[in-house]
Amino acid sequence: MGATQSFQSVGDLTPAEKDLIRSTWDQLMTHRTGFVADVFIRIFHNDPTAQRKFPQMAGLSPAELRTSRQMHAHAIRVSALMTTYIDEMDTEVLPELLATLTRTHDKNHVGKKNYDLFGKVLMEAIKAELGVGFTKQVHDAWAKTFAIVQGVLITKHAS
């Protein structure tokens, strides 16, 4: 996978799928810190060892995490990055942005198992936030998008 390969050529997202990703992301970002905090709380619940990768949040309960300044700061950073990735879906820069993310995650020993869990809980959190708006089309668009991104991250991780 070349560094200049575009998101479209990597995954063949349709214009309708891209529109669904962008519109649902806009909905999710109306509660950005709460939504992203929920994703990480779900990760920590499913894999308590993951919480130790965040020393400033280690040992905090879910209730404490929801009000933690560190969690809010992390949620803002993650939501800003994800917004950038979504904004850059159609550009040649996305693989480079993901390569930077991979380098950061490599330093923290984040790998396929962690990406798999993130994808699982991301879908759970999107479904919980969107409720009846979480249609099969929304599910499929997010699943396809995450599979594409995960593929790039794992490929960059291995190289």
UniProtKB/Swiss-Prot annotation:
Keyword Metal-binding in annotation = yes
Database matches in InterPro entries: Globin (IPR000971), Globin-like_sf (IPR009050), Globin/Proto (IPR012292), Mb-like_M (IPR044399)
Cross-referenced PROSITE patterns, in alphabetical order?
GLOBIN
Binding positions for heme b?
A: 74, 105
List GO molecular-function terms, semicolon-separated: heme binding; metal ion binding; oxygen binding; oxygen carrier activity
Q: Which residues carry this modification: N-acetylglycine?
A: 2
**What are the residue boundaries of the Globin domain, all occurrences included?**
12-158
Keywords of this entry: Acetylation, Heme, Iron, Metal-binding, Oxygen transport, Transport
Q: Where are the transmembrane segments?
A: none
Q: Which residue windows are coiled coil?
A: none
Miscellaneous section? Caudina arenicola coelomocytes contain four hemoglobin chains labeled A, B, C, D.
* Similarity-based family: Belongs to the globin family.
- Known partners and oligomeric status: Homodimer.
Annotated protein name in UniProt: Globin D, coelomic
